[in-house]
Amino acid sequence: SDTETFVAMKMHIDNWRWAGVPIYMRTGKKLSETVLEVVVEFNKPPRELFGKSEANRLRFRLGANDGVDISLQAKEPGTKLLTRQVDLTVEFAHEFGERQGPYERLLNAAIVGDHFRFTRIDAVLHSWKILDELLKSPTQLHPYFEGTWGPDNAEALVPNGWAPVGSQVNR
């Protein structure tokens, strides 16, 4: 296709709290699966006392299967200095019961005048300002196959690779 259907980008938030923290995002059509997740990958300590280990992650699952997962390295019981990844999971439907569907929530918010679910005009205008700059300087398209996670060169964007998402995660 000659139409842009995939984007992978590295972003930064320009304030003191998030200074120096890279934010990576990718989205596209006909990828391996549809997943709405935000993954926070914590820095590893300067020294790994228990050998090579996975990074600790905090995962927010959005959409049909809302929840929060924390994946962390925990020392195994006993005298040996061994760790393994342990996952702690909260399934929102289990904890809080089933909720309204997305369209039902949106229509209800519009009816009762709840502005929380709607984008403010200043955010829309700022988004268009960014998009206009991108459209003025088109970039080379990188094709990818349907059912993959995007073009190969998108993998190089994230130094240690993209965090596993969706069915890639052992739950």
Language-model-detected regions and their locations in the chain:
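Secretory/organelle targeting and membrane-embedding segments
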Residues: 1-171
